[in-house]
Amino acid sequence: MPELLNKTKTNLNFENIKILIKKFQSPFWVYDSNIIHKKINLLKEFDIVRFAQKACSNIHILRLMKQKNIKVDAVSLGEIERALVAGFKPNSNEIIFTADLFDEETLSKVIDFKIPVNAGSIDMLEQLGKLSPGHHVWLRINPGFGHGHSKKTNTGGENSKHGIWNPRLAIPIIKKYKLKLIGLHMHIGSGVNYKHLKKVGQAMIEKAMEINEKILFISAGGGLPIPYTFNEKPIDTKKYFIIWDEARKKISRFLNTPIQLEIEPGRFLVAESGILISQVRAIKKMGDKNFVLIDAGFNDLMRPTMYGSYHHVSVVTKDDRNIHETETIDTIIGGPLCESGDIFTQKEGGNITTRKLPILKIGDYLIFHDVGAYGASMSSNYNTRPLIQEILLENNTFRTIRRRQKINELLNLEK
């Protein structure tokens, strides 16, 4: 949930932001490790917490997770390599590879390091089984329905590419190659509510009974929402656990075997820990519309453009002048890209909206809240713009965990 900079008890406050602004070139990301620790503690009832690193894959964030005994999910060869560099062990359940297909290079690496595979297609099982009989596998099941904060984050149902539609068809392949089925996984999308959660839990029970094979784990997947606006309520993690624990117990009784309950949060652990600091570089009027243009674009923060996502915005003035919060104007916030869609105030489908902001000056700073998930990890080099710096606040100090990329580093790839 966004917190006012002058009232927050976190390290993401006015004083620290002003220090960082003086020291580092905007735009840049900032994370507060204390917030991540608190979010981890909310999930301690689950047997296994596995971080969906696609939300924030910085190696230093992964190391922070490992220090707290959090395991990791990887969805690409690059994420496998990140996990290994961060200290997660191969040939164990510390890393699981989740996907709907293998490319040859990734398949080879998964086999070499004996990384368990959460298979989202029958073809994956066939390809893995031929080369690595006995490999540990999960089945990622598409329950036939989905849910998400955006149509683009819905990962269940017949319009989704994710998961195995009929998991019974996987069993002959698993037995043919003597693959070791260790778990069932179900994830229907991001921003799941309790009603959908109960439906997913029941679907997991039905699929486990239908398959009727001994397993060690079930995974609740991810999708735990966070409140991006002031009027949203945080999810009740105890209620979330109870729903899945009931499913686990029913499956355990049916299969007559103990089963561990795993959860795979991404956004929930890191979103509220991060902010994006940007600077106002141009102000102009287009007809009746007021535009404020900043030095960060959708190459940095993609979510508003891709999903129509809302992020609360705070203002820090360059000259410490007092801002009258009641004296606001409707403002469209745009970035520097040569792209009409480079607008931070839009809804899904590209409909432009406004924010009520105080009257700004060139050099003032806009702070985007709750960007620790799918912020830096979704950044690109569009318009040949370098990736920006990432900073971690930890143990009452701050350090760079990714330096600013140089343009020459981009050009050298093409020489």
Swiss-Prot record:
Q: Which GO terms describe its biological process?
A: lysine biosynthetic process via diaminopimelate
N6-(pyridoxal phosphate)lysine modification, residue list = 54
Record SUPFAM superfamilies: Alanine racemase C-terminal domain-like, PLP-binding barrel
Q: In which pathway does it act?
A: Amino-acid biosynthesis; L-lysine biosynthesis via DAP pathway; L-lysine from DL-2,6-diaminopimelate: step 1/1
Keyword annotations for this protein, in alphabetical order, are:
Amino-acid biosynthesis, Decarboxylase, Lyase, Lysine biosynthesis, Pyridoxal phosphate
Q: Signal peptide: which range, if any?
A: none
Q: Which HAMAP family match?
A: LysA
On subunit structure and binding partners, the annotation says:
Homodimer.
Recorded family membership? Belongs to the Orn/Lys/Arg decarboxylase class-II family. LysA subfamily.
Query: What's the name of the protein?
Result: Diaminopimelate decarboxylase
Q: Which organism is it from?
A: Buchnera aphidicola subsp. Schizaphis graminum (strain Sg)
Q: Which gene encodes it?
A: lysA
